[in-house]
Design a protein with these regions (language model features):
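Exposed, interaction-prone extracellular/peripheral surfaces
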Residues: 1-45, 55-63, 69-71, 78-286
């Protein structure tokens, strides 16, 4: 059973990897300018000026322990540098039954598109010398060869975007449909902001979730296993549904902005390159 699950994960990772090159090639026009140091990367003295300690966590390398600081208390501390924090981008894509949905076979699921964008962005960041973290991973992914291990780790990500290992002032990029109640998302983003993180939120939806193109009697089923909801004339609800979605999206954008995150949307029937390039430009401007 475990071997079968591993094979499925490997196959998905390989499929994602096979789709990466076109995205990376088109986005390297932006990455080329990044390589020249446009955003002020501090190459000299990278590890000299540390400015923060955090408690040791399982999975941290012993070589990163600051024994002098640790000797002053009954806790073990990890030393982190300003350069390390500034160069770290933490990536997270939501999992769950709702993300595994698509309205028609010609489209990717929201999960597939989220993972595709996460890995494509990671490829660009790794090429530019950034340190990439996945929420829940014990250590950073560094160097272009780290893309495959990152893809393999995606099914093991933290269930919610929370990770006490992330260095203060790192940037976070979150991929999800963000259809949960606003207060739930607010709590998650507020916790990241309190940790010193800022970043970007990308809402990924299926086109049918925006337009509600159905007509007649429709029976909606909860992907999480809840009771089905039969609706006799779905077209009569289209306007109210779209208005509610617009209010939810406006709320997402407002709370993200209030906590130091930018907000953008993407549909699975749109080219992934559009979202990737816009997101990469935002990262380089942050």
């Amino acid at each position: 059973m475990a071997e079968a699950a591993h094979n499925i994960v490997t196959a998905r990772a390989e499929a994602l990897g096979a789709r990466l090159p076109p995205l990376v090639v088109k986005a390297e026009r932006i990455a080329a300018t990044v390589m020249q140091g446009v955003h002020g990367r501090r190459r000299s003295g990278q590890g000299d000026a540390f400015w923060q300690f955090r408690p040791y966590l399982p999975g941290d390398a012993a070589s990163r322990v600051d024994w002098r600081q640790s000797a002053r208390s009954d806790r073990v501390f990890i030393r982190e540098t300003e350069w390390e924090a500034a160069q770290t981008v933490a990536l997270w894509s939501a999992r769950g039954p709702g993300m595994a949905w698509r309205s028609r076979d010609a489209l990717p699921t929201k999960q597939e598109r989220a993972d595709e964008l996460l890995l494509a962005l990671a490829a660009l960041l790794l090429r530019g010398g950034e340190r990439v973290r996945a929420f829940g991973a014990p250590r950073a992914f560094i160097g272009r060869a780290a893309l495959a291990p990152l893809a393999g780790f995606l099914p093991e990500q933290a269930v919610i975007p929370s990770d006490p290992r992330l260095p203060r002032h790192a940037r976070a990029v979150l991929f999800s449909d963000f259809l949960a109640p606003l207060e739930e998302t607010r709590a998650q983003l507020a916790a990241l902001a309190a940790q010193g993180l800022r970043g970007h939120v990308l809402q990924i939806l299926d086109s049918a979730e925006e337009t509600l193109p159905f007509a007649g009697h429709i029976r909606f089923e909860d992907p999480a296993g809840g009771a089905p909801a039969p609706i006799p004339r779905i077209e009569a609800l289209r306007g109210a549904y779209q208005a509610a979605l617009a209010r939810h999206r406006e709320g997402l954008a407002a709370l993200a902005l209030s906590l130091g995150f930018s907000f953008a949307t993407h549909r699975t029937d749109q080219p992934p390159e559009l979202a990737l390039l816009a997101l990469f430009q935002r990262l380089e401007g942050s």
